[in-house]
Every structure is written in C-alpha cells, then in structure tokens.
C-alpha cells in the first residue's frame, strides 16, 4: 500500500477491514475507534424528532401529545371462491334461459338469490345491511312496523262500522219581506198620495171600491190575518157609504199597492245605463244607477275588473256594464 502524506509526514496504511456491526470498511487504526461508537449507537434507539415541540418551546402554546395510531381492524377472510361460484351459476342460468327461448321450451327456474354473509339481516323487512347501516335501519324499521300494525288493528276494529257521512244542510232561506216591511222600503221614494188623488174619467166610488178590493186581497193572503173573517161578509150588514173594516183598521196596504203599481209601471230603462221613473209628471233617477255598490265590479263577459267606479263599458271587450 502506498503511504499518505499527512502534516508533512508519510503514514503507512494497511488493508481496509470491515466493521462487524454496520459492515462498513475502515483502516485498522480507524476501525479501533469506530468499533465502540458503532456498538453504542446500535444498542441505543434514537428518538423521533418532533418539530412541533421544538417550535412550541419558549411560547405559551401547550405541547400537544401525539395521537396514538389506531389499531387497524382485523381483515375479514375473503370469500372469493363463493363469489366465483355464484358468478358461474348466474352465467349458466342466463345461457339456459337463452337456449329455452330459442327452442321454445319451458323456462328454467331462476337461480336462488345470493347474499353477502358479512351483511346483517333486518328481522322486520328481511333486508341485509352492513354494520353501520344496520344499526340505523333496524331502529327505524322497528318503529315503522309498530305503526303499520297499529293501523291494521284500527282498520279491523272499524271495518264493521259504516263510514260516517256528513249530512247535507240546505242553506237558510231568506225571509221574504211582508207588506208592512215593504212599505218602509218603498216609503223612502217620492210617491204620490193615493188618498187625495182622483183618476180622471173614473168616478170616486169606483176608485174607493177598487182600493178596498185590493186591500181585502192582501189581507186574506197574508198569514197574519188568516183567522179574521172576510170583510165582504161584514159589508152586507153595514151601509155602503161606511168604510169597510179592512180600510178602517189598516188603510196602508191599499195605498201601497197603488203606489207600487204606479212605480213599476212608470219604470223606464234608458240605453245609456241610467234608470228613471216618472212620478207626478217628473223624472227621478233610480238609486241603482247612482250607488256604486249595485254595479258589478267585474265584466260578466270576459271577467276584467273595471278600472274606475263610473265606467259604463268594459275596457277589454266593450260590453256594457251590468247593473245588479
């Protein structure tokens, strides 16, 4: 071996010798120093370096203990052979079905259903789930089965009883106005006095007799006077000049009928939508034309709402506004 010059001197070097612990080769002089150090490092385990603890030194951050690794769950044995056999059985069943369809013979029975033995079967619906899904499903399926059984009991109990039907109630009939109430509504309108007015060309006796006959008819037709005797029977006893008891007791109905006749006969409908009635030779506009509550708010033809209250025609179809 050639010598190496070190610090101006020549050092004689022998052959390289391997270390018994780590297997590296050293010169004999260096191997004597390396042997005890290598033996010491081999026996002593080195701690793993944690950089988070080094960064947390000198600060208020508490040192967090490292999380221990969770042990891995044991692996279940694979049932590859069973899966392989089920796969072959399904292929053979499909081939047998195709052959039976071609030949036109009877169809073979379907293969039995396959299931995974690792899955847990639900005792209520007979389905299978893995462990996590089975824990959630079984509780839900239990409550659902209890509800369905309760409904079945209730239906069997009420099976013999007839179903209750809601009885139809007819709408309440509106009370028809009696002659007394009709007189209050019609008395607001300006009407001629029937007592003092005489018809031209007709004797006064005929007018009084016609008014009395109308009053008698109203009195006999009204339900409140059913028990009273007919006034014409009393008229035979009393003289003709005296007024009959029907007019003496209640003279208003005869006058009201005359007023009502004159009002209805003189009712005129104008083409512009206003209604007028001629009383005592004068024209008076009807209440229906003036009050907005009696006019329809929507068109009866197209259903469009009138933009203003005083509109007379529909702005969409042009139909005249209807008076209710």
From Swiss-Prot:
Annotated PANTHER family: C2H2 ZINC FINGER CGI-62-RELATED (PTHR13555), ZINC FINGER C2HC DOMAIN-CONTAINING PROTEIN 1A (PTHR13555:SF25)
The record's annotation in InterPro entries points to: ZC2HC1A/B-like, Znf_C2HC_C3H
Q: Which UniProt keywords apply?
A: Metal-binding, Phosphoprotein, Repeat, Zinc, Zinc-finger
Q: Biased-composition ranges for Low complexity?
A: 176-187, 196-215
Modification type Phosphothreonine: residues: 243
Q: What is this protein called?
A: Zinc finger C2HC domain-containing protein 1A
- Keyword Iron annotated: no
Transmembrane feature ranges = none
Q: Where exactly are the zinc fingers annotated as C2HC/C3H-type? A: 15-44, 118-147
Annotated binding of Zn(2+) 1, by residue: 19, 22, 34, 38
Identify the residues that bind Zn(2+) 2.
122, 125, 137, 141
Swiss-Prot/TrEMBL cofactor(s):
Zn(2+)
Query: Coiled coil where?
Result: none
Tell me the classification of the organism that encodes this protein. Answer: Eukaryota, Metazoa, Chordata, Craniata, Vertebrata
Pfam families in UniProt: zf-C2HC_2
Family affiliation: Belongs to the ZC2HC1 family.
Q: Which residues carry this modification: Phosphoserine?
A: 222, 291
Annotated region Disordered: the residues are 43-83, 150-224, 236-259
Compositionally biased region (Basic and acidic residues): 48-58
A Gene Ontology molecular function term for this protein is: zinc ion binding
């Amino acid at each position: 071996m050639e010598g190496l010059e070190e610090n101006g001197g020549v050092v004689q070097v022998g052959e390289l010798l391997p270390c018994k612990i780590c297997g590296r080769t050293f010169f004999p002089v260096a191997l004597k120093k390396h042997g005890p150090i290598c033996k010491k490092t081999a026996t002593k385990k080195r701690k793993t370096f944690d950089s988070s603890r080094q960064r947390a030194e000198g600060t208020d951050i508490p040192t967090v203990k490292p999380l221990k690794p969770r042990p891995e769950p044991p692996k279940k044995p694979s049932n590859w052979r069973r899966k392989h056999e089920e796969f072959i059985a399904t292929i053979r069943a499909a081939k047998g079905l195709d052959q039976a369809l071609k030949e036109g013979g009877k169809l073979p029975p379907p293969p039995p259903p396959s299931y995974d033995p690792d899955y847990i079967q639900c005792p209520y619906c007979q389905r299978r789930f893995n462990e996590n899904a089975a824990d959630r499903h079984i509780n839900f399926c239990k409550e659902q089965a209890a509800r369905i059984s309760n409904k079945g009991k209730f239906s069997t109990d009420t099976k013999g009883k007839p179903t209750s039907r809601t009885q139809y109630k007819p709408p309440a009939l509106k009370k028809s106005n009696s002659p007394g109430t009709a007189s209050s509504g019609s008395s607001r309108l300006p009407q001629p006095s029937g007592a003092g007015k005489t018809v031209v060309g007709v004797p006064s006796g005929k007018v009084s007799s016609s008014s009395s006959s109308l009053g008698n008819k109203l009195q006999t037709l009204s339900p409140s006077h059913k028990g009273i005797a007919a006034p014409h029977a009393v008229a035979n006893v009393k003289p003709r000049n005296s007024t009959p008891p029907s007019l003496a007791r209640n003279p208003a109905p005869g006058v009201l009928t005359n007023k009502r006749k004159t009002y209805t006969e003189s009712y005129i409908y104008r083409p512009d939508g206003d209604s007028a009635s001629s009383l005592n030779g004068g024209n008076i506009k009807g209440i229906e034309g003036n009050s907005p509550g009696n006019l329809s708010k929507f068109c009866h033809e197209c259903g469009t709402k009138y933009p203003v209250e005083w509109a007379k025609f529909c702005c969409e179809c042009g139909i005249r506004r209807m008076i209710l």
